[in-house]
């Protein structure tokens, strides 16, 4: 699966049902929050990252922020974009985007198809194969823009994404060689549709309706012992030792966002610009979890030998919200805006293990909003100060080991104070923006895990509890500078500090009070230099550095800081572009994820295990583009 974190807040996994994401994720208005694998990014036009709570316009799924991916829209003229790549580790991809305008200039259409394949950077010694962790990702997308008249227009998006990846990424030796006899799968087949209608109403304003739906079938499975009987017998003298877990999910969403924006030429009282809206989201998810084992020692349920168990569950959540905002000019260059969102979330959960004692339905009434002051300082410089409140709904803890008082957890709220500046003028070689922020988390939801049987790598309990408070604060900046007609440098940087505050109860023994939150690196820095010669030659060298961070709240294991470099060299000639690229130029070894638990028999000592990031990869990409006229 693909998860996101913003300013140190977000998810890193979902092993059970009852999803509850902190980062909203949209692709062409279609909600894929918590299931981000359809972001294959071919023919992408823009990725907008809204950091911090989006309590007015988006609500419960955007406590930490919102990521919105916009793919290329239809144009007025015939257009064609084709791309093919080959690379090391048997990487190859091909994609095509084609579109044209409609008769009488009333709109346009665009069709996209792309396929990406790679072996996944692992070698499974048991099968002597390089594809057990491989990638097989296909995308089909169609977009239609129709201008009915000067006032009414419609945009329709249809998409199908088929992710058929393997999952065999872990080794007890923390290397790229695995020993799994039951390699897992990381699959997602998603269909999505979005219809955006915009109507300009004379004397009132603009009415916008966005209706979207998505259906995702997800398979997530893995070899629970990361080995095979021959390997474990030779390594430890113990066998059989064989565990496997699979989770089949079917998630559906249906959403409607109806918004009326007042005509700015007819502001209320001559100075108030306004917006009102209503939002509804229905999410359902059915899960089938299966565990299988063949163990020399006690497996799930306390019996040695072979066996299996299953857990079927159903989850549903309905969000309904009303929101609005006002903006007023305080002078020729200064404006003040405020927004308010009131949202109700009803959620229910039931599973086959607790059918006799069902989970009580949970209802959360939540309020968010923002107050912002902006000032145009002239010469392309803008300043802002924002106070915002975001929120996230409560949820359920699953499993027979969960105590009755821990079966549910309450909503979390977040106050954010942010100030920043932006300097941008087309004729100016320097483009810059920077901000500082402080976020206070109240009734902070903290995700915990505990291994119940030391001799069983699958016997885990996962649960979320509300800690007292937390804080996240830092500095972010990004910018670019043109050194001349051929050279440009760019970069971004962030400093982040996070802490748990005033924890109690189940968290006391963990010693996390004052400690940093997981997946919250202290710094992140990127820098790039680009060269574009008049003859079509170009080059780009970029570097990305990341500080260490805690993997989980439940233990004190941390990653190591690292940096990666990438290089691209190429030439443009007419409609053709060819580029040679190298990712992870110096073949750095770094960890993407880490676990700390007992896996290796016979004593099963707790120890650290790492999932390594991708090694150096070299490839060639060729593009063909016909000029396009933007609408």
Region locations from a protein language model:
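C-terminal beta-signal and adjacent terminal beta-strands/loops
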Residues: 440, 484, 545-552, 571-631
